[in-house]
Structure formats: structure tokens, C-alpha cells
């Protein structure tokens, strides 16, 4: 009987140990100051871009999210890539035929910043059905980093989530669930152009509160618990509680519309029948339970 050598080792990603010094108030204050320096323009569709419209951004953002999910990228890669894309479009007019090339390039650079083993140019070209060549992607990479003045370490909502969770008196198992759902909300917000005007800290805080409310975590009176959390996080990020609450409601509305859209894609006939019932019952007044979402 022949002896076979089998490699049973599983490739694990090397990570640094959690450092509590990185979660202190001094670091958070520095992050809140820095986040505005890498913010895109809110009005670039009207002032800069001639061919690209918000619906095109939505399409390429959804494609980028699917690529990141299929490649099991780190959670920070997609929001960071969208930050690069919005900042570039805030500075440089772009033909719509080159928007997918820009999206692939943004993922390429963000992956280098956040991944141990980054995405390759060849792999990203495959995801475009080889409509772009690796050489084009590398040329676009040089243009991107020059337009962004090599300021690539932008703040994303993910950078703030851990700070918020460390300050909240929740059980560790609850924090893990909140973190998972908040990260999903952050990715969802990055696909929607309405959230460009919100700083990353507010998107992160709104996602955490929306996750808590949807999961019914906290005290037995969940509404009171979320109300207190909203006021607490608004003090942490130094914003008006009403602004944070509005951001949270936007996130819940976006989730609801995304679920409705997904349902229509699965079963259009059933959706039409259910739409009439929903209008009569007025179900839009209650936020969607995030436990119904397959994350």
C-alpha cells in the first residue's frame, strides 16, 4: 500500500492581538477629527460628473459588494473602496464606460490596504468578464492614488464600531451579534448615495442602534434602551441626537426597501399580491426585524 503525503494544514490569516490602548478616548477623538479630511463631495453628480448618475453608482457598488463577498474580503475593504470611488468622482470627470474600471481599481487598492493576501489585478479583470486588462487597471491605480494624493488611510464606519461596542454595557455574546449586523448595515449604506453626506462615525452609530433595535437587545423595554443608546452615542460622536436618530431611520428604511427589492426579484407575482395587503395594513410604520435577514 502506497503511503500518501496529505497536506491537512489550513491557511489561517495572521492577526494582531486586540490592544485596548487603541480603544481609548484619545484615539477616538483623533479619529473624529480625521474623518472629515477624507470625505467626498456631496454634490459631485451635479458639479463634476457629466455622464455618471446615482443609479450607475448603485449598480457598480452592488457589483463591488458581490465581488468582495465572493472573495471573502475583510469587512473594511468594501466601504474603503467606496470611499476611494466617491472621492475620485468628486475630483475627476469620468466616462461611464470606465466606471467599472474605477470600481475594480478601488477594490484593488483597498484590498492592498486591508488584506493580508490582497486581490490580484488578474482576478479582478476576470470579474469584469475580461472587459478590462491588467495593464489598464494598473494605470488606473496610478491615476487614483495621485488624485487622492496618496491619502489612502481613510476612516470608515468599521473603524468606529469597535469603539462604540467597547463603551456599551452589553454582554459579549450580544456585542458579537450587534457587530455582525452593524457591519452588514455599513455595507448596505455604502451602496446608497444618500449616505455620502453622513460622516463615518454617524453611519457606524446609526448602524449599531439599528442593530440593537432590530434584534430586541438591551433592557426588557427595548425602545427605552435604544433611546438611551442613541443619546449616549450622540454624545460620544458629538452630534445632535435627532440627527443620529434620522440616520438610524434612514438605515432601517434602506434595509426595508432592499428586502422588498430582493423579494420582488425572487417572486414578482407573490410580491404584487402582498403589496396590496401591506398598503391596507400600513406595515411601513414598523422597522424591519433584522433577524429576518440572512447575513
UniProtKB/Swiss-Prot annotation:
Tissue specificity statement from the Swiss-Prot or TrEMBL entry: Expressed in the intestinal epithelium.
GO cellular component, one term: cyclin-dependent protein kinase holoenzyme complex
Residue numbers of Phosphothreonine PTMs: 286
Region (Disordered): 262-283
Single GO molecular function: kinase activity
Domain of life: Eukaryota
Any Pfam family: Cyclin_C
Protein keywords: Cell cycle, Cell division, Cyclin, Cytoplasm, Isopeptide bond, Membrane, Nucleus, Phosphoprotein, Repressor, Transcription, Transcription regulation, Ubl conjugation
Cross-link (Glycyl lysine isopeptide (Lys-Gly) (interchain with G-Cter in ubiquitin)): 269
Occurrences of domain Cyclin N-terminal (ranges): 28-152
One BP annotation, GO: liver regeneration
Zinc-finger in keyword set: no
PTM annotation: Phosphorylation at Thr-286 by MAP kinases is required for ubiquitination and degradation by the DCX(AMBRA1) complex. It also plays an essential role for recognition by the FBXO31 component of SCF (SKP1-cullin-F-box) protein ligase complex following DNA damage.
InterPro entries assigned: Cyclin, Cyclin-like_dom, Cyclin-like_sf, Cyclin_C-dom, Cyclin_N, Cyclins_cyclin-box
Localization (cell): Nucleus; Cytoplasm; Nucleus membrane
Task performed by this protein: Regulatory component of the cyclin D1-CDK4 (DC) complex that phosphorylates and inhibits members of the retinoblastoma (RB) protein family including RB1 and regulates the cell-cycle during G(1)/S transition. Phosphorylation of RB1 allows dissociation of the transcription factor E2F from the RB/E2F complex and the subsequent transcription of E2F target genes which are responsible for the progression through the G(1) phase. Hypophosphorylates RB1 in early G(1) phase. Cyclin D-CDK4 complexes are major integrators of various mitogenenic and antimitogenic signals.
Subunit annotation: Interacts with either CDK4 or CDK6 protein kinase to form a serine/threonine kinase holoenzyme complex. The cyclin subunit imparts substrate specificity to the complex. Component of the ternary complex CCND1/CDK4/CDKN1B required for nuclear translocation and modulation of CDK4-mediated kinase activity. Interacts directly with CDKN1B. Can form similar complexes with either CDKN1A or CDKN2A. Interacts with UHRF2; the interaction ubiquitinates CCND1 and appears to occur independently of phosphorylation. Interacts with USP2.
Family: Belongs to the cyclin family. Cyclin D subfamily.
Record protein name field: G1/S-specific cyclin-D1
Organism: Mus musculus (Mouse)
